[in-house]
C-alpha cells in the first residue's frame, strides 16, 4: 500500500446510466483500499455519475466529473469505422486533458472496444508514462459473436485489434479466471492481459438458505434474457420439463431477441420494466439453483456478472462448461453441475435427484463461500496494488 499522495484517473465512456454500476462501485472500493491516500477522479456520463456517487458516499477522496460518453457523430453506428474512430479520438482528448500535469499513479478505461483499444491503448505512451488498465467487460465476447461483413469495420473491431500489441505500460484487465488464457490462444502476441477476479460487494452477500424441506426446487435464469446468454435454451428446458418438483424462473429483464419465445411455463417471467437491484437480489435469494446455459464462445472472453450474483447469494450452478468455469473449478473446487451440451443439460434436469443435490450442496456452498471471501474488495486490494506496481 502506497503512502505518497498520487492521483488515479478513471474513465467510463461506454456505460449508460445504470450499466456496470455494481462493478464500478466494486472497483472503486478495491482502489480505495489499495491506495488509501490517493485522490481518485471518476469520469462518466452525467446520469451514470449521479447513480454511482451515492453508492460510494462512505468512501473519502473520490471526486466525480461528468464527461461526454463515447458517441459517434452524425448518427453513425459505433461499428462504422469513421464514426467509431471519431468518437474514440474525442475520448482520447478527454483523457489527455484530464491527466496532463497530474501526479498520476494509474489511469483506467472502464470498458474498451476496438476503437478505444486503437486510439487510447495503442497510443497511450504518447499521453502519459503512468500505467493504463483497460477493463474488459463483454466487448471482446460480443465481437466474437457478431462481426461486420465490411472488411474495414472488421479490421477495427476488438477481435482484430486484440492481435496488436500494446505499450508495456498498458494492460488489458480480464475480470475472470481463464480469460487470459483464451486471449493467449486467440492472439499469442498479445502479452498485455492481467487478471483481477471480479469483485463481489459484501453489502450484497446473502446467508445460506437451504431448500424448503418438501417444496419444489427452484431453478432460475438470472439477468437480461438475451439469446447470447442462453435464455432460449433455458425457456426450452422449462417447456420440455415434465417434473412437478421443479420450478423454473427468470429473474431479470426481457430482451428483444427472445421476446417471441413462449414463457408461459415459467413461474416468474422476464420483467417488462426496469428491475431494481434490491428486488433482483431478493429474488435470487429465494431460489435454489442458478442455470447458466452460456453456450456462446463469447463467455470464454467474458466475466459473467450473473456468476458473481450466484456467488454472492451462495447458489450452486447448472451451467455449460467453458474455459472460465474450468479455471474457477480448478482453483476453488466444484460449484455445481457442469454439462458439455444442450442434450446433457436436458438429461441432467430430467433426472435430477433431490437427495443427490442436497448431498452435494454443502461442498458446493463451501466453495462458493471461498470464492466470495477471496473476491471481497478488501481481499483483492493488496494483489491489485502489486499489479499496478507504482
Residue ranges and their predicted role:
Residues 84-86, 93-117, 131-133, 289:
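Short N-terminal targeting/anchoring amphipathic segment
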Residues 34-86, 253-257:
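N-terminal strand-loop element at the rim of the active site
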Residues 8-9, 107-109, 124-146:
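Active-site proximal beta-strand in glycosyltransferases
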Residues 292-308, 320-322, 326-327:
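Nucleotide-sugar-dependent
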Residues 18-22, 340-350, 354-389:
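A charged, aromatic-enriched C-terminal amphipathic alpha-helix characteristic of glycosyltransferases
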Residues 201-204, 212-263, 274-278:
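Conserved catalytic-core segment of nucleotide-activated headgroup transferases in glycan assembly
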Residues 11-29, 47-52, 226-229:
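A short, glycine/small-residue-rich beta-strand->loop->alpha-helix junction that serves as a flexible
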Residues 140-142, 149-173:
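Membrane-proximal helix-turn-helix segments that form the acceptor-binding/catalytic region
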Amino acid at each position: 500500500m502506497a503512502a505518497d499522495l498520487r492521483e488515479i484517473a478513471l474513465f467510463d465512456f461506454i456505460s449508460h446510466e445504470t450499466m456496470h454500476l455494481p462493478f464500478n462501485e466494486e472497483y472503486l472500493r478495491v482502489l480505495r483500499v489499495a491506495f488509501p491516500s490517493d485522490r481518485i477522479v471518476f469520469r462518466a456520463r452525467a446520469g451514470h455519475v449521479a447513480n454511482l456517487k451515492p453508492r460510494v458516499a462512505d468512501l473519502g477522496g473520490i471526486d466525480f466529473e461528468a464527461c461526454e460518453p463515447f458517441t459517434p457523430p452524425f448518427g453513425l453506428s459505433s461499428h462504422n469505422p469513421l464514426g467509431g474512430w471519431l468518437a474514440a479520438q474525442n475520448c482520447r482528448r478527454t483523457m489527455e486533458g484530464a491527466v496532463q500535469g497530474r501526479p498520476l499513479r494509474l489511469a483506467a478505461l472502464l470498458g474498451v472496444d476496438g476503437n478505444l483499444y486503437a486510439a487510447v491503448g495503442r497510443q497511450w505512451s504518447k499521453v502519459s508514462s503512468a500505467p493504463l488498465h483497460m477493463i474488459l467487460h463483454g466487448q471482446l465476447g460480443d465481437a466474437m459473436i457478431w462481426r461486420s461483413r465490411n472488411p474495414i469495420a472488421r479490421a477495427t473491431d476488438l477481435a482484430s485489434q486484440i492481435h496488436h500489441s500494446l505499450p508495456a505500460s498498458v494492460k488489458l484487465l480480464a475480470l475472470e479466471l481463464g480469460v487470459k488464457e483464451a486471449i493467449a490462444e486467440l492472439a499469442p502476441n498479445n502479452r498485455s492481459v492481467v487478471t483481477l477476479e471480479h469483485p463481489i460487494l459484501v453489502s450484497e452477500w446473502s446467508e445460506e438458505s437451504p431448500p424448503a424441506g418438501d417444496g419444489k426446487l427452484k431453478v432460475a435464469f438470472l439477468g437480461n434474457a438475451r439469446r447470447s446468454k442462453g435464455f432460449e435454451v433455458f425457456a426450452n428446458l422449462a417447456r420440455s420439463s415434465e417434473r412437478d418438483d421443479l420450478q423454473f424462473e427468470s429473474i431479470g429483464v426481457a430482451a428483444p431477441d427472445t421476446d417471441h419465445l413462449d414463457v408461459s411455463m415459467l413461474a416468474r417471467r422476464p420483467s417488462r420494466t426496469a428491475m431494481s437491484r434490491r428486488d433482483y437480489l431478493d429474488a435470487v435469494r429465494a431460489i435454489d439453483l442458478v442455470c447458466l446455459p452460456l453456450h456462446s464462445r463469447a463467455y470464454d472472453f467474458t466475466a459473467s456478472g450473473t456468476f458473481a450474483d450466484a456467488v454472492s447469494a451462495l447458489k450452486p450452478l447448472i451451467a455449460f462448461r467453458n474455459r472460465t468455469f474450468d479455471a474457477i473449478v480448478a482453483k476453488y473446487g466444484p460449484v455445481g453441475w457442469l454439462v458439455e451440451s444442450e442434450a446433457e443439460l436436458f438429461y441432467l434436469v430430467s433426472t435430477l435427484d433431490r437427495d443427490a443435490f442436497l448431498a452435494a450442496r454443502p461442498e458446493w456452498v463451501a466453495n462458493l463461500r471461498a470464492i466470495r471471501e477471496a473476491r471481497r474488495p478488501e481481499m483483492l486490494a493488496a494483489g491489485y496494488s502489486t499489479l499496478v506496481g507504482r
